[in-house]
UniProtKB/Swiss-Prot annotation:
Pfam families linked: EXOC6_Sec15_N, Sec15_C
PANTHER family assigned to the protein according to its UniProt record, in alphabetical order: EXOCYST COMPLEX COMPONENT SEC15B, SEC15
Organism listed in the record: Arabidopsis thaliana (Mouse-ear cress)
Subcellular location: Cytoplasm, Cytosol; Cytoplasm, Cytoskeleton, Phragmoplast; Secreted, Cell wall; Secreted, Extracellular exosome
A single GO BP: acceptance of pollen
Family of the protein in this entry: Belongs to the SEC15 family.
Known role: Component of the exocyst complex involved in the docking of exocytic vesicles with fusion sites on the plasma membrane during regulated or polarized secretion. Involved in polarized cell growth and organ morphogenesis. During cytokinesis, involved in cell plate initiation, cell plate maturation and formation of new primary cell wall.
Protein's name according to its UniProt entry: Exocyst complex component SEC15B
Cross-referenced InterPro entries: EXOC6/Sec15 (IPR007225), EXOC6/Sec15_C (IPR046361), EXOC6/Sec15_C_dom1 (IPR042045), EXOC6_Sec15_N (IPR048359), EXOC6PINT-1/Sec15/Tip20_C_dom2 (IPR042044)
Main location: cytoplasm
GO annotations of cellular component type: cytoskeleton; cytosol; exocyst; extracellular exosome; phragmoplast; plasma membrane; plasmodesma
Keywords: Cell wall, Cytoplasm, Cytoskeleton, Exocytosis, Secreted, Transport
Assembly mode: The exocyst complex is composed of SEC3, SEC5, SEC6, SEC8, SEC10, EXO70A1 and EXO84B. Interacts with EXO84B. Binds to EXO70H1 AND EXO70B2. Binds directly to B1L.
Range of residues in the leader sequence: none
């Protein structure tokens, strides 16, 4: 209990000390805030918040008592200075009184002296007023004189037609003089006459502008013709330059001569550059031959009259009416281009584009309608050329012509269909006039026109004249038609906005050759070829057409601006393959019919004879005579490769005919002598083939002999000592691969020795059988088993 009481006493002592220190801290804070001029609001709020305002009052009183001693010390320090200042003020009172009396005396003297001066000043002011009135009168008179001078000058300008200067005078009078004019009469006159003068000037320039609108219609027509003509001449120069370039490239490729290069100087003309002089006064002259001075004068006058926007709209409306009524497209828009660039804002680019869009829409509609009605390719080409020239002419002035070119491109297929139809008629007429005779050329120009121009020559050496060509007149006639088609197609495709159009030209050229010319030739072969000579001539023509087709594609590539290597890379097969094969098949068929006539002599052959014909059978001699005659004639017309194919077919037909005869009912039995006679016949065919050495190489001669390999192997089999070897697969593949086992069985049965038959065995019973016959019997038996 004692210890707890002791702790309480210590605690109360500590709390009392804490309260004293807190009060001292508050006094210090308040003193510091007052000294520093800080706000005492927080202290007041805190004090009232605790409910003890007497503490704050106690602190403030304590602070005031602490500052009283300081105030007393300050007063004691400055007491003597206050006393001295009061003494100084008392000493100044006497000086002030003396100064006041001196000022009063000076004022009296000044008033006495200034009285005469005031009267003089009044006189001066009166004189100045009179002078000012006189000056005003002189100024008014001078003003009126200047106004009258301007009026006189305006009248002179009006009389001389210098309306702009007259309006400038009127504007000067109105803005600078009329409000200041002192004469009411003169002012009323000016107010009445100035609007009349402006109205007069407006009427005069509107009349001049109306005359210009009438004149520019004729000028636009002539200007358009001149522009189109210039574009056409420029295109012609480009074509001539391209032709020279192609010739130079060809000569360089062939190394015929050294190439000579030169600069081609061309004068820059009005149309070529599309930019004229910048003289805004004449705005027309030069090569174009039209004057915009009346237009610009009217525009300038209306701007001076503050009617510029009205005149712009008036001009645009009139030009729009002229465009829809006259439709002079080229000249109209050349004029508008000049006005746009030199008119000083008379017409905006947007307005020109609006007029151009209107014209393009109308032209596209007209072209669509006209193209849909046209049934002649030449008419469509003429329209296309004119439209493309129009596009070239106006493109130089920055007009967009893509819509027009799209219309032309859209009718590309129709144009080519019409062109194909025209060429079909021309080719049909050319083929119907063909006499199937070799073409005779008497002069060198005929050779150049019919052979060299289409690169049909097989040698660079010019032949002697008269020259008989291996082809008939239909070949150059058809070549001219095809060349014209190519040139017309290129003409339509060029200058149309499409740079690479060779593929399009090639596509339609393929159609012309593959559909039109090929079908026409097929029809000619099927309806008009009735003899070997005619068939041979057609086959010869087809070989020449093969060279001509190479020229056609090269010519199309040249005209299209495509390098030959690229054109050769995209080449396809010969487009006249059908008619070429048909012509050769027709010739082969006719020759086979001729051969069949000679092969009927096989009926006269004694197939059971024991005598071998030393010079061959009659039918073979006749066939060889005909073949030799045929070759001697065909060599002059047919190319070697065509003649080889035809001869191979004929020889194969001879072989088939002989084998067919051996297998047929005509031959009942074959003797060894008959087989050896056939061997002689085949040897004659071998000799004939070998005699074709100038025409054939050794390899080709061996290939030619394969045409009658069937009859050769048949004879070799029948003459062999062991015909049974035929059934040996290895031997058959090596020596008898062209033989059919059924034919072998039939011929072997006929070739069997009659002594080996059933009735022949009675006379030879007990004798030994011939080994060859035994082998043949075994072959026949084996073949029967197979069948």
């Amino acid at each position: 209990m004692q210890s707890s009481k002791g702790r309480r006493k210590v605690g109360s002592t500590t709390a009392g000390a804490g309260i004293d220190s807190a009060e001292k801290l508050d006094e210090l804070l308040i003193s510091s805030a007052i000294c520093n001029g800080e706000d005492l609001g927080p202290f007041v709020r805190k004090t009232f918040g605790t409910g003890k305002p007497e503490t704050l009052l106690h602190h403030l009183k304590f602070f005031a008592r602490s500052k009283e001693s300081e105030i007393e010390e300050v007063c004691k320090a400055h007491y003597q200075d206050f006393i001295h200042a009061v003494d100084d003020l008392k000493s100044l009172l006497s000086d002030v009184e003396s100064l006041k009396s001196a000022l009063s005396d000076s004022n009296s003297k000044l008033q006495s002296v200034a009285a005469p001066l005031l009267s003089s000043l009044d006189s001066l002011v009166e004189a100045q007023t009179v002078s000012k009135n006189v000056d005003l009168a002189i100024g008014a008179v001078t003003h009126c004189v200047r106004v009258m001078e301007l009026v006189s000058r305006a009248n002179q300008h009006l009389q001389s037609g210098n309306f702009y200067m007259a309006l400038k005078c009127v504007d000067s009078i109105e803005s600078d003089f009329m409000e200041k004019t002192p004469s009411s009469t003169l002012k009323r006159m000016l107010e009445n006459r100035i609007p009349a003068i402006r109205s007069y000037v407006e009427r005069k320039v509107n009349k001049e502008f109306g005359d210009w609108l009438v004149e520019i219609r004729v000028v636009s027509r002539n200007l358009g013709q001149l522009a189109i003509g210039e574009a056409s001449a420029a295109r012609q120069r480009e074509e001539e330059l391209r032709i020279k370039q192609r010739q130079a490239e060809e000569q360089s490729r062939l190394s015929l001569r050294d190439c000579v290069y030169a600069l081609n100087e061309e004068e820059d003309d009005e149309f070529g550059s599309g930019h004229e002089g910048s003289d805004g006064g004449s705005s027309g002259g030069g090569l174009l031959g039209f004057d915009l001075t009346p237009l610009y004068r009217a525009y300038h006058i209306h701007q001076t009259l503050s009617l510029g926007d009205t005149f712009k709209q008036y001009y645009y409306n009139n030009r729009d009416l002229q465009l829809t009524s006259d439709f002079q497209i080229a000249g109209f828009f050349i004029v508008e281009d000049r006005v746009l660039r030199t008119g000083g804002g008379l017409i905006s680019k947007l307005e020109v584009e609006t007029l151009w869009d209107t014209a393009v829409t109308k032209m596209c509609a007209v072209l669509e309608d006209q193209f849909s009605r046209m049934q002649t390719a030449n008419h469509l080409l003429l329209i296309k050329d004119y439209v493309s020239l129009l596009g070239v002419s106006l493109r130089r002035y920055g007009y967009a012509v893509d819509s027009l070119l799209e219309v032309l491109s859209k009718h590309r297929d129709k144009y080519h269909e019409l062109l194909l139809s025209d060429c079909r008629k021309q080719i049909t007429e050319a083929l119907s006039a063909d006499k199937f005779e070799q073409m005779l050329m008497k002069k060198e120009y005929e050779y150049s026109m019919n052979v060299l121009s289409f690169q049909l020559q097989t040698s660079e050496i010019v032949p002697a004249f008269p020259f008989i060509a291996p082809f008939s007149t239909t070949v150059p006639d058809c070549c001219r038609i095809v060349r014209s088609f190519i040139e017309d197609s290129v003409s339509f495709m060029s200058h149309g906005g499409q740079l690479d159009f060779y593929d399009v030209v090639k596509k339609y050229l393929d159609r012309l050759l593959g559909e039109v010319l090929d079908e026409a030739l097929l029809k000619l072969i099927s309806t008009s070829v009735h003899g070997v000579s005619q068939a041979m001539q057609v086959a010869a023509n087809m070989a020449v057409f093969e060279r001509a087709c190479d020229f056609f594609f090269r010519h199309a590539a040249h005209l299209s601006g495509v390098p030959l290597r690229m054109a050769e890379r995209g080449r396809r097969h010969f487009p006249l393959t059908k008619s070429q094969n048909t012509a050769e098949d027709t010739l082969s068929g006719m020759l086979k019919k001729k051969i069949d006539g000679f092969m009927t002599l096989l009926e006269n052959v004694n197939w059971t004879s024991d005598d071998i014909p030393q010079g061959g059978n009659e039918y073979m001699n006749e066939v060889l005579i005909y073949l030799e005659t045929l070759v001697s004639t065909a060599q002059q017309i047919l190319p070697a490769k065509v003649l080889k194919r035809v001869l191979r077919d004929v020889l194969a037909h001879i072989s088939e005919k002989i084998v067919g005869t051996l297998c047929g009912d005509l031959v009942k039995r074959l003797s060894m002598a008959a087989i050896k006679g056939l061997d002689v016949d085949i040897q004659l065919l071998d000799s004939f083939t070998e005699n074709l050495t100038p025409l054939l190489t050794d390899k080709e001669a061996r290939e030619m002999k394969k045409a009658f390999v069937e009859i050769r192997q048949m004879i070799n089999l029948l003459l062999s000592s062991h015909p049974e070897n035929f059934v040996n697969p290895v031997i058959r593949e090596r020596s008898y691969n062209a033989l059919d086992y059924r034919k072998v069985a039939t011929v072997s049965e006929k070739f069997r020795d009659p002594s080996d038959s059933i009735f022949g065995t009675f006379g030879t019973r007990g004798s030994r059988q011939n080994p060859k016959n035994k082998s043949l019997d075994a072959l026949i038996k084996r073949l029967k088993d197979v069948s």
